[in-house]
Amino acid sequence: TRINSFLRFDSNLLNAFRSIGSIEGVDYVDLNYPEHFADYDIEVIKAKMEECGLRCNAINLRFRDKYIGGEFGNHEPAISQDAITLCREAADACRKLGGNQMIIWLGFDGFDYSFQIDYVSYWNRIVKAFRDVCDYSKVPVSIEYKPYEERVHAFIDSFGTAVSILHDVDRENLGVTLDFCHMLMKRENPAYSLALAARKNKLYGLSRR
């Protein structure tokens, strides 16, 4: 389960583990990086999860206001590199917690009006960044797409675009996480997208929130 829904009522991460662990049948959690790691050492997080009978399913990357001009595709090399470094740190955290995958949603990589960006250069920067992250990561890396928000138009906005990224990045440990609501926002056929991703063993996760 996602921890954020529990943190709305109690901002203490360790208390959230306790609440989730008390629910019968729930034994995996997703954590956001870096926000859920801000107040506790990773060993403390791991110990509390084990105490509550929980395991890490995935680490979800969360990029904040610093990346409002884009994460991987940002035209400023220093900011793009910072985004890559954040993913590397998240991969380390995922591995230490025994997580199954790292999920990357590039909410700020996109544009708000036509011709705002050089689309080809932007694409190439994103592909290069994913290669860097995948080559570093010891865990599977999954792309979660959304058609819009935080930008008017997300760069990786659809199943088709995500699959094209997978093709160009060309790494065995890169796949997709399909969010049911995001697919409906894009007016996609969720079952169709799921079947095509699974056909190539690239379906790394399915979210129904």
Description of each model-found segment:
Residues 2-11, 74, 117, 152-160, ...:
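Gly/Pro-rich active-site loop or hairpin
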Residues 51, 55-56, 70-175:
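Active-site acidic/histidine proton-transfer and metal-coordination neighborhood
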Residues 62-65, 107-109, 209:
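Short connector loops/turns at beta-strand edges and beta->alpha or beta->beta junctions
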